[in-house]
Amino acid sequence: MPAEHTCLRPPDARLGMAGSGTTLVECKLLGRRAVGVDINPDAVMVARNRLDFAYTPLDAEYKVPEIRTYIGDARSLDLIESESVDLIATHPPYASIIPYSHDREGDLSNVHSIAEFAEEMTKVALECFRVLKPGKHCAMLMGDTRRNKHFVPITPRVLMSFLEAGFILREDIIKLQWKMKSTREKWFGKKYDFYLIGHEHLYVFRKPEAGEKVTKFRESMKWW
């Protein structure tokens, strides 16, 4: 992610799911402080390994940022202070589409019930809202699935979870998927002959400023 495409200045702090560490590496290259949290210990170890490199930037003012990683649950970010984060970037599992950590307790990729998954994502949304500074953004990439040869909309349920937490929807960016060689749809699509889901939603939410009059954003907020 080029510097001109990020809303974080070097002193700002970013929070994200550690995953394979790609985003944390970009934060290091850009000089952005970051915290990576993941429920999977293997993912945290991979992220730490990928962060272990020397970097000599062209920018003379570059300073090596503080980047922390730890094993944790997005539903309980107890090591992160309230209103201390400038940007959240996360790519949660899509219910039980692809197992993430092999039956680790608390892993949402093991939750088969879509209703239960949406309920747990509401807890994630509330924690994201708590740790994010007022006026700052939370970006979340989410996709849908198909069961019994029918489309199952996960994204609108998760969208409603974040609006329920108090967020304002700033953007809905459609991410097209190309050459899907490792998704569940690719595994079963040819056998059962159905249309591949070729996109994901990148939702960008904004936390209102303290005392902000949000009535003008009512169409972009919780409406039910």
Language model segments and positions:
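Class I S-adenosyl-L-methionine-dependent methyltransferase catalytic core
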Residues: 1-224
